Amino acid sequence: MKKGTLVSVVLLLAAVSLGYAQEPGPGGLHGSVDVTYLSKYVWRGFDIYNDKSAIQPSVNLDLGGGVGASVMGHRANSSGYEDGERWDYYLHYSNAINPGEKNAVNYRIGYVYYNYPDMSSSIADLQELHAILSFPNILPVKGLVPTYVLVKLWPSESGSMVGCKSPAGGTASGFAHIFMLDYGIPVQGMGTGSPEQVINLHSEVVFNDGVGPNGANVDQDWSNAVFGISTTFDLGGNFSLTPGVYHQVTMDKSVNPDNDETWASVSATYKF
């Protein structure tokens, strides 16, 4: 019943979004509807579905004034992982300081509620606050952008099984620090009516402050580094397709005992 309600919310948001998209006035609602397939789902170093593929539907809304909201689901394509299905409810505010200047800062402040619909909210649900700071012009190489992300995660309820009294001896409460470097390389467009597209090179390294989202006993250490490449193909009619390949170097066995991970993804997106 709980799962059905959540799916209904996503479908309703998608229907409303597409309804607005029929006549997208300058002041109307804007955003995107997206479905992503992943050959495996790795989240902040953790292999969530034990090397199984996953599907991620989402609806993203631009509410204006820098405010945005989204709903994203995560579900394994194999049976046996129903308890690991997760829905993320995300509200955020984005803006910029000194745009166009060398010391420009693009920032986002966000709140996420992580809900596991097949489990009680008192067992596994999580909440998160994060701040994202990007510096688009600080480096002399055009398109090379460093980003820092500060994450604070905590159990939705104080008596949660993933809280400070987790049977596994760990906690889902604490901080993570993520350092990213992205490089966009413009190339001749390969999509419909697109004269140019961008090859995106992504890298990140994560310092985990001892946070296990499932209450696992996780070390306070540099946990993992990720390297990836992706690009977006313009299919016309506001549709696009984004394939990507990623590789994780695991530095902390308490986060991922399977050593390194490699996976692919493909996203189909409609913007309105």
Residue ranges of model-derived segments:
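Residues that define the transmembrane beta-barrel architecture of outer-membrane proteins
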Residues: 27-29, 51-55, 83-87, 105, ...
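Residues on the lipid-exposed face of transmembrane beta-strands in outer-membrane beta-barrel proteins
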Residues: 35-37, 57-63, 89-95, 111, ...
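Short loop/turn motifs that connect adjacent beta-strands in outer-membrane beta-barrel proteins
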Residues: 22-30, 66, 96-106, 121-122, ...
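Short glycine/proline- and aromatic-enriched beta-strand/turn motifs that initiate or cap beta-hairpins
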Residues: 22-77, 263
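Glycine- and aromatic-enriched membrane insertion/assembly motifs of diderm outer-membrane
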Residues: 50-109, 113, 138-140, 144-146, ...
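Sequence/structural signature of outer-membrane beta-barrel proteins
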Residues: 38-44, 72-80, 96-100, 112-120, ...
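Cleavable N-terminal export/targeting peptides
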Residues: 1-30
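Detector for outer-membrane/organellar transmembrane beta-barrel domains
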Residues: 126-218, 222-225, 247, 270
